[in-house]
Regions:
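Conserved ABC ATPase signature
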Residues: 135-139, 143
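Conserved ABC ATPase "signature" region
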Residues: 113-131, 182-183
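The feature captures the beta-strand-to-loop junction immediately N-terminal to the Walker
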Residues: 37-39
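Helix-to-loop junction immediately C-terminal to a conserved catalytic motif
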Residues: 52
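Conserved ABC transporter NBD signature motif
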Residues: 60-71, 79, 118
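A short, proline-enriched helix->beta-strand linker immediately N-terminal to the Walker B motif
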Residues: 154-158
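Glycine/charge-rich catalytic "coupling/switch" loops of P-loop NTPases
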Residues: 264-313, 333-362
Length: 362
C-alpha cells in the first residue's frame, strides 16, 4: 500500500470575492511527483499557500508526514522546515548566486560542511558552477529558476512545492529545465507537489494527477487513468478530449455498450452501463484512424467505422488536426505525410475508425 506523505481533508478557504476553495480529499504519495492541473483561477496557488502556511485555512486538516500542520499545538515552524517552495516568479536576493544558494543553511544555523556533497551534486546537475559569483540580475529566467530549485533541494526537503515554476520561461528553456530538474527529483526521490495549467506538462512529468475546477477537486488518480478515463465532462475537456458525444445506451452485450447517438448513428464502447441511460462517449483524437477508401475498411475488425467529411484542417505543431463531420463532430490527429499520402483536403470524404476499447463512457 502506498505511503501517503500528504493528506488533505475537508479543507475550506473563503475569500471576500466569493471564491471558495473546498477540498474534500486530496493526497500525495511519498516519493511521487503529484501534479494538480486546472484552469487559471481554479485555486491551485491558494492550495500551495495553505499547505505552506502562507495562508490560514477556515477549516479542515492538512496532515503532512504524520502531523496536522493546521493544528497550532504542533510545531509549525519545524513542519515548514521539512518543505521547500519554488514560485512562478524567482525569488532571489541582491547578492551572489552562491550566497542565495546558502541562504536556507544560514537561516537555520547549519554548517555548510553537512550539505557540501549535496551542494556539489546540485550545481553540477543544474549547470550552475560557472554562475556562482554572478548576481541573479544578470541571469536568464531559466537560470534564475535553476538557482531557486537548487536552493530548495539543498536541504533535502520531505516535499517540494512548485507553483507553476515554468510559466514565464520560453519553450526551449522550459524543455531543457524540465528534463534537468525532474531527473534530479526522480534520482533523489523527492516528493513533489506540482501545479500547472499545462496538461501536456502534467502528462510528461507526473506519477499521479489531480484536476481542480472552481475550487473543487474533480478527479485524482494515476495520470493514465485521469487522461484516458475522465469521470465527467469538465475533466474530459480539460485533459484535451474534444470529441464528447451524448447518447442513450441502446444495448449491452459481453461488456460492449451500444450507444444510440440520434437513432441512426451508433457508437460501440467497451465498459459497463445501464440500458436506457444517457451517457457521454469520449474519443481522444490520437485514437482515430483515418481511411480514404471504403474498400479498405473491410479488413478492419473494429466496431466503429464512421463515414464523414473533413470540415477543417488545423496545424498543431507535430500533427495536423482534422475536424470531421460524421453526423457528429469528430477530431482526429494525423501527420503531414499521411495527409499527402491519402490526398486529404477540406471537403474530402473519409472513413474514421475507432476501437471500442479506446472509447471511454461516463
Amino acid at each position: 500500500m502506498a505511503d501517503k506523505i500528504l493528506e488533505i481533508r475537508n479543507l475550506k478557504k473563503q475569500f471576500s470575492t466569493g471564491f471558495l476553495l473546498n477540498i474534500d480529499y486530496l493526497y500525495t504519495n511519498r516519493n511521487d511527483i503529484f501534479t494538480l492541473i486546472g484552469p487559471n483561477g481554479s485555486g491551485k496557488s491558494t492550495l500551495i499557500y495553505l499547505i505552506n502556511l502562507l495562508l490560514s485555512a477556515d477549516s479542515g486538516s492538512i496532515v503532512f508526514d504524520g502531523e496536522d500542520i493546521l493544528d497550532k499545538k504542533n510545531n509549525q515552524k519545524k513542519i515548514r522546515e521539512k518543505m521547500a517552495v519554488v514560485f512562478q516568479e524567482p525569488i532571489l536576493f541582491n547578492t551572489s548566486v552562491y550566497n542565495n544558494l546558502l541562504l536556507g543553511l544560514r537561516l537555520r544555523n547549519i554548517e555548510f560542511s553537512e550539505y557540501k556533497d549535496n551542494f556539489n551534486f546540485l550545481i553540477e546537475k543544474l549547470k550552475l558552477k560557472n554562475l556562482l559569483s554572478r548576481s541573479p540580475k544578470t541571469l536568464s529566467g531559466g537560470e534564475q529558476q535553476k538557482v531557486c530549485l537548487a536552493r530548495a533541494l539543498l536541504l533535502n526537503p520531505k516535499i517540494l512545492l512548485f507553483d507553476e515554476p515554468l510559466a514565464n520561461i520560453d519553450q526551449e528553456t522550459r524543455e531543457e529545465f524540465r528534463g534537468d530538474f525532474f531527473e534530479i527529483l526522480k534520482q533523489k526521490g523527492t516528493t513533489t507537489f506540482y501545479i500547472t495549467h499545462d496538461r501536456n506538462e502534467a502528462m510528461i512529468i507526473s506519477d499521479f494527477v489531480g484536476v481542480i475546477e472552481n475550487g473543487t477537486i474533480e478527479q485524482i488518480g494515476p495520470k493514465e487513468e485521469v487522461f484516458r478515463r475522465p469521470v465527467n465532462e469538465k475533466v474530459a475537456k480539460f485533459v484535451g478530449i474534444e470529441t464528447l458525444i451524448s447518447g442513450i445506451v441502446n444495448n449491452m452485450q459481453n461488456s460492449v455498450i451500444e450507444i444510440s447517438v440520434d437513432g441512426s448513428n451508433f457508437i460501440y464502447a467497451v465498459g459497463e452501463s445501464i440500458k436506457g441511460k444517457r451517457v457521454m462517449a469520449a474519443i481522444r483524437p490520437e485514437d482515430v484512424i483515418i481511411i480514404a477508401k471504403s474498400e479498405e475498411t473491410t479488413s478492419l475488425s473494429t466496431l466503429n467505422i464512421f463515414k464523414g467529411k473533413i470540415k477543417e484542417i488545423k496545424d498543431t505543431g507535430l500533427f495536423k488536426k482534422l475536424e470531421i463531420d460524421c453526423g457528429f463532430s469528430l477530431a482526429a490527429y494525423i501527420t503531414d505525410a499521411s495527409i499527402n499520402r491519402l490526398g486529404l483536403k477540406i471537403g474530402s470524404e473519409i472513413f474514421a475508425a475507432v476501437k471500442a476499447s479506446a472509447i471511454h463512457v461516463f
